[in-house]
């Protein structure tokens, strides 16, 4: 009798083990179907209920009024980030659905979560060294705006969400300016988890080729020497090698030079407005996958899944080195004297690789218009050695200040600094400080709004040292802190995605006081008589410049702009430096 009971118990245990290995989720990407927002969240809720080492949490709000979720997968039922970090585990953060018309990552991450939790092919061992955090759908509003007509260049899946969010923002331009609640929530999530590796999943239709998936690698030149070396010698080549051993080969993102990949492609430089560029501000290894829109949806999902599993494997296998490289990178960053602001590709530095593409022609006859166009001939695939330009040179760099001073009036900037964990102190009393300031000499603004802003380009400045009145409560920000790159990229006006470029300081570009020629005449005359050296300079300009000599207002303006009457705050950038 006892033997029968034991046998029954063993049989029950075996049945449970076998049952536990079965997938929980029923995904339908093979049918060219991607789940709705509610279906996605329900699937993660099922995994949460089934596995004690997985947890679905609400991690902030989105513009559509629905929460932004994170799904945490650990080796044990521990979800406190500080306790996890104390165990020495690396963190892999995966973001999906930023452009819901590009849903491969949504399906692939669901498949990955289901498989790693049921330990398919021994995947669960990766959790020994790495905790995985998944954002199921980032652009919730866009994913709810579902239609069969949101992606004109994309045949499958049959219905997808929309690129814009509830405020019609492209959220992959919003990570630093944070116009959306989505981005504010993401910034909090990112600072909470401080991911060692970050992946954002996308789809591209920029070119046609034989690959189902392309990769925007971390931009090595953004990183301190130890991390740059780790990227170039280990992470990037290892992931390419692991991917090429699988069903779906990987190619660098096809950032072409002359419209045809055969002419060579460039390493993509991702600005901080993009998720991967934002990650690099904190020395996190940020990257994007770009699935190829013209491939069948099932292949896009499976190739994205292959990349996610490859990345999880690499992150776990190299967890200790990844964490150590970031720590060393921070030390190297804090020792820097100068900081690069702008880059250009180094055309002398390239490697070659075999690219699998299609022959191109500028004489393809359009079936609708009957006119010639550029196109690819899929009946003529090729494998060619092409150049890959992988290195950039610094064009402009700045001396790193010891402190920034930011007046408390600029609350929107301060909110974003706080959100990203910037350390600062406030002045305890009113005081005059000698500081270096920038004056904005020239800039171009977009003629039409770009993601809700009139972005500034072609900025030129000059520096002055001035004594400026500051007040109790103004911010004194030490630059040499863990958030140094974020500070430099956001507060230096000429940095590629600075707060200045995104119009946070535009009110300083307006002049508040003016002169009336009639009212200013007597004051101008008295000033010239009281300042003979300036009078000589003024008369010399009038003698040398005939147009100036004929222009009544221009002459008075010259006196106004070059004397004590001029507004010192006009075009004076509010963030000052102390060295």
Task: Name every feature range the model reports, one short phrase each.
Residues 7-17:
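Bacterial N-terminal signal peptides
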């Amino acid at each position: 009798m006892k033997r029968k009971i034991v046998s029954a118990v063993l049989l029950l245990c075996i049945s449970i083990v076998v049952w536990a290995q079965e997938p929980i989720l029923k995904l339908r990407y093979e049918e060219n179907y991607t789940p709705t927002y509610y279906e996605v969240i329900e699937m993660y809720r099922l995994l949460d209920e089934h596995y004690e080492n997985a947890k679905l949490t609400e991690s902030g709000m989105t513009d559509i009024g629905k929460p932004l979720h994170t799904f945490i997968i650990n080796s044990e039922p521990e979800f406190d980030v500080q306790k996890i970090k104390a165990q020495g585990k690396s963190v892999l953060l995966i973001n999906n659905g930023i452009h819901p018309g590009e849903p491969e990552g949504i399906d692939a991450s669901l498949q990955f979560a289901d498989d790693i939790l049921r330990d398919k092919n021994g995947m669960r061992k990766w959790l020994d060294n790495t905790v995985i955090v998944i954002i199921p759908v980032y652009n919730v509003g866009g994913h709810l705006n579902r239609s069969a007509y949101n992606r004109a260049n994309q045949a499958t899946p049959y219905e997808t969400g929309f690129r814009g969010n509830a405020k019609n923002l492209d959220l992959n331009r919003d990570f630093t300016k944070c116009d959306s609640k989505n981005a504010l929530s993401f910034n909090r999530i990112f600072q909470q988890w401080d991911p060692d590796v970050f992946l954002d999943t996308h789809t591209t239709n920029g070119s046609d080729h034989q690959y189902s998936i392309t990769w925007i690698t971390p931009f090595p030149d953004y990183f301190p020497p130890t991390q740059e070396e780790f990227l170039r010698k280990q992470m990037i080549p290892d992931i390419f090698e692991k991917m090429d051993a699988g069903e779906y080969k990987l190619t660098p993102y096809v950032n072409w030079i002359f419209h045809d990949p055969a002419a060579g492609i460039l390493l993509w430089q991702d600005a901080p407005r993009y998720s991967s560029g934002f990650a690099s501000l904190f020395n996190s290894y940020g990257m994007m996958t770009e699935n190829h829109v013209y491939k069948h949806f099932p292949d896009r999902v499976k190739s994205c899944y292959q990349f996610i599993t490859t990345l999880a494997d690499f992150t776990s296998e190299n967890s200790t080195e990844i964490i150590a490289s970031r720590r060393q990178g921070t030390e190297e960053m804090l020792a820097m004297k100068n900081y690069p602001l702008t880059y250009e590709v180094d055309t002398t530095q390239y490697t070659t690789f075999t690219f699998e593409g299609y022959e191109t022609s500028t004489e393809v006859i359009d079936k609708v218009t009957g006119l010639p166009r550029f196109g690819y001939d899929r009946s003529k695939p090729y494998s060619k050695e092409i150049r890959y330009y992988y290195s950039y040179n610094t064009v402009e760099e700045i001396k790193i200040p010891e402190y920034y001073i930011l007046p408390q009036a600029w609350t929107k900037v301060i909110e974003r600094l706080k959100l990203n964990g910037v350390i600062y102190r406030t002045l305890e009393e009113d005081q005059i400080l000698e500081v270096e300031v920038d004056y904005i000499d020239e800039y171009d603004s977009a003629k039409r709004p770009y993601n809700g802003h009139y972005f500034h380009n072609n900025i030129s400045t000059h520096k002055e040292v001035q004594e400026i009145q500051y007040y109790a409560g103004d911010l004194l920000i030490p630059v040499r802190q863990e958030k140094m790159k974020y500070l430099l990229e956001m507060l230096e006006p000429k940095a590629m995605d600075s707060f200045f470029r995104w119009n946070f300081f535009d009110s300083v570009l307006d002049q508040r006081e003016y002169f009336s020629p009639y009212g200013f005449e007597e004051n101008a005359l008295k000033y010239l008589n009281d300042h003979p050296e300036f009078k000589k300079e003024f008369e010399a300009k009038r003698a040398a410049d005939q147009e100036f000599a004929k222009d009544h207002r221009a002459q008075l303006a010259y006196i106004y702009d070059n004397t004590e009457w001029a507004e010192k705050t006009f075009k004076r950038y509010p963030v000052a430096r102390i060295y």
